[in-house]
């Protein structure tokens, strides 16, 4: 006889997901967890529908667009709202890692471990920020050569994240490049969040970003048909100054690209 789903107390489900009981109750009320109420207490159905983990890559090959700042601030704000957040630093310059106060990173703590073993390294828990981080270091530069030597290696992070169920959101800070390491981060998630500096430089950079996004989407079609057809999910204006006509023209240009990033 087939065994039906059993009920899990809110406290136990909170411990499993690594979030607070209040957050579990909120997810129940929002319809993101299937649950039943027995008397005064809620119970989550084991095997019921759970909100899918969302993963996005902050991506642009143009430096100075505010990509890393956005990754940090989005991660912090989501964590502040009660979501379980993992940040992944894929840039050997390790600016995100440094800004979060993480020092003395060992190679096995970075994505170098992923490329060697196929497994994510254990993340660092940042208590002050209430989020987790897979840090970067200069050692990560060695990954570029390893990725060039292995077919389909740029899908390693995507594959590993599909097994990761502890987080509501994964935010990946890509390096300003169009190389293999950038592709590893770009193809790992559910699409790209693209910061666009409101300047001529920012608009010019969009051409390369859109070409790269199209190439990534075509590559994913062969192995991940569930990937969204529109791979750029959002353009985020940065360094905007409402007092300048140039910035306002660029902002209008970004707004006109809704078909590319609805």
Question: Which residue stretches match the model-derived regions?
Answer:
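Major-groove DNA-recognition helix of helix-turn-helix-type DNA-binding domains
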Residues: 17-41
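Polyanion-binding surface elements
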Residues: 1-21
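P-loop NTP-binding core
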Residues: 4-6, 37-41, 46-262
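Hydrophobic, helix-prone linear segments
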Residues: 1, 16, 34-35, 165
